[in-house]
């Protein structure tokens, strides 16, 4: 899985709502693309605007980066002041099995998961 994370702050020219509206427009089309696992946008209490895309594979993300939709995303980013952009390449995903493993007492081998 590959995750794109964007965070930006409002500028004197564009408000947080302006950025959020632009991102929401992208979310609708992005979610329909093959290989997209999810796409969302939101604003937190300090007015930072967040945009996240998750893709099944790196080839899916590469296809996305070459798309017209991504060109629209780049145009939004160019209107922001120092947007933070990060690509995370997730190679392992685990669930509660990891919690059980991590909480197992090494000396006894007993799991220490409380199920109250």
Predicted features, each with a name:
Residues 1-49, 56-68, 82-116:
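Short S/T/G/P-rich N-terminal loop/turn motif that feeds into the first structured element of a domain
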Residues 53, 64-65, 74-77:
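Short, flexible helix/strand-to-coil boundary loops that buttress conserved ligand/catalytic motifs
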Residues 72-79, 89:
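Outer-membrane beta-barrel domain signature
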């Amino acid at each position: 899985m590959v995750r794109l994370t964007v965070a930006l702050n409002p500028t004197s020219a564009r408000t947080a709502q302006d950025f959020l509206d632009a991102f929401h427009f992208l979310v609708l089309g992005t979610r329909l693309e093959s290989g997209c696992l999810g796409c969302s946008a939101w604003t937190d209490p300090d007015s930072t605007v967040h945009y996240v895309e998750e893709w099944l594979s790196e080839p899916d993300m590469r296809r996305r980066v070459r798309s017209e939709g991504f060109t629209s995303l780049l145009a939004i980013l160019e209107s922001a002041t120092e947007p933070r952009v990060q690509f995370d390449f997730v190679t392992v995903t685990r669930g509660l099995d990891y919690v059980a493993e991590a909480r197992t007492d090494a000396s006894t081998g007993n799991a220490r998961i409380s199920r109250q």
